[in-house]
UniProtKB/Swiss-Prot annotation:
[4Fe-4S] cluster 1 binds at residues 568, 571, 574, 607. Its cofactor is [4Fe-4S] cluster. GO terms for molecular function: 4 iron, 4 sulfur cluster binding; indolepyruvate ferredoxin oxidoreductase activity; metal ion binding; thiamine pyrophosphate binding. This is Indolepyruvate oxidoreductase subunit IorA. Residues 558-587, 588-617 form the 4Fe-4S ferredoxin-type domain. GO terms for biological process: organic acid metabolic process; sulfur compound biosynthetic process. Catalyzes the ferredoxin-dependent oxidative decarboxylation of arylpyruvates.
Amino acid sequence: MELEDILNAREGDKLFLLGNEATVRAAIESGVGVASTYPGTPSSEIGNVLSGIAKRAGMYFEFSVNEKVALEVAAAAAASGVRSFTFMKHVGLNVASDSFMSTAYTGVRAGMVVLTADDPSMFSSQNEQDNRHYARLACLPLLEPSDPQEVLEFMNHAFELSEDYGLPVLLRTTTRVSHMRGVVEVGSRMREPSEGFFRKDPERFVPVPATARVMHRKLVDKMKELRIRADESELNRVFNGGSDSELGVVASGGAFNYVYDALESLGLELPVLKLGFTYPFPAGLVEEFLSGLKRVLVVEEVDPIMEREVLAVAGSARLDLDVHGKLDGTLPEIYEYNEDILRKAISGLTGAPSVERECDVPDIPERPPSLCPGCPHRAVYYAVRRAADELELSGDEIIFPTDIGCYTLGIEPPYSAADYLLSMGSSIGTSCGFSAATTQRIVSFIGDSTFFHAGIPPLINAVHNKQRFVLVVLDNRTTAMTGGQPHPGLPVDGMGDEAPEISIEEIVRASGVEFVETVNPMNIKRTSETVKRALEHESVAVVISKYPCMLSSGAVRGRPMAVDGEKCDLCLECIRDLACPAMVTREGEVFIDPLKCRGCSVCLQICPAGAIKPEGKG
């Protein structure tokens, strides 16, 4: 969808939007003045779109250094009377959770929406956590849209709800809702962004113990009012209410879509309660829905949160009712759902014949994820492996903690340079632990954006506590895996304006690291020699690999490489140890695809026979 259409569409216009794009339109309609994020799939497109149109919409937008900062930026804006919107992937809310929990106590003066993009089945994440738990933990209202139209409507509703109760509102999407595309009828711009002014009120905004106790009581009282609001909310709807079936369905979020499709394919009309306002749980509405049923199927992704609520409602009301879902094995406990799963479950409960869809899928070769041709990370992994081999460090003698980013693909052979991963920035913290607990050598990897996000405190910890390991900072001049967003190490901000460029090398030196060297990873010999010296250093050593991502605007494409068949002795070191996707064996010969080759020349440097040269050179 063109950015101009999202920005300039008029009330009643219909746009074909991603769920993520619909959030941007909602932010414009609701008069958001400040928006912030740290990029992370499946929420990344929101920031990409906002980056392109925020200034023209009269909105301030930033790619914050991490999610905690992003939430704090939004919270302060909302406390100043400016509507704010912060968004992040599900694990990002872990990073922001300290301040997120406190915003429930302090509240807001203008609407504040926190979007969490959950990732059932972990398509791009290290875990499958269900962030609906955060609403309960913080005592904040939770809305769950099912499609792009609802994303727009629910988000606009969330700002009104936020201001009615002076609380942030959590909006939960999932990967399919974020990346689903649908027709969205847009509304009008209800208000324009306004300039804020912070009126001091320490008893409200400074939660020391004495004031926090008062804040908590007020929050509990607000939740009592919100329970009534949830019971009466128009975001909760009953479908097929006239059905006389003894089996009903309670569903929320993207999972509702699978229920709808499954019922349609089975030709059934079961009563369905679709919950959009899911916390506080609308117990009164649910009890009313359950009262005419003998059985109910609860459909949700990922944890059985609503199912336990339904069980509690049924038990409290002493309803003679069987509750089916995850807990009794009717539905899978984990991963995202689909129409087939729901059709099978409903068929099993109703006895309706389930029509299995036949799909003739041809066998295709496996395509494991791979670093791009010319990726500087590949060169680094090769150089590190060469340095380790020359120092006779192999197998369990050397540990490779890694981090979140494209370079996590270092787990794949032939590099096999990813042994331990927890979260953003964990490569450095876990290196401290391995250094303290073992005598094994350690080389850890972290990206440039991840270093700014969460790498600086553990690096200071490492220096202060006299740990010993090598840290390789993979500075490819962008936040690559999520789409090439800027970070503080670049001279541009989230709205495309010129900004101060923060030097990673200067930060590392200021942290007390004595061994700091910056290398061009495409120079294999120098990079390998630098890593060897770093491994021999007696304390923390940092090697900064600085070279632009091949997908970025700053990348330079060189002349493609070619193989001299007369010189090539088919040792296959280039295929076996470098594993560049541009290099293949064809009819018993090594071949470099000129359309894929980026001309980085790494293969030329490592060929023992000197059989690789720039294309067209004799």
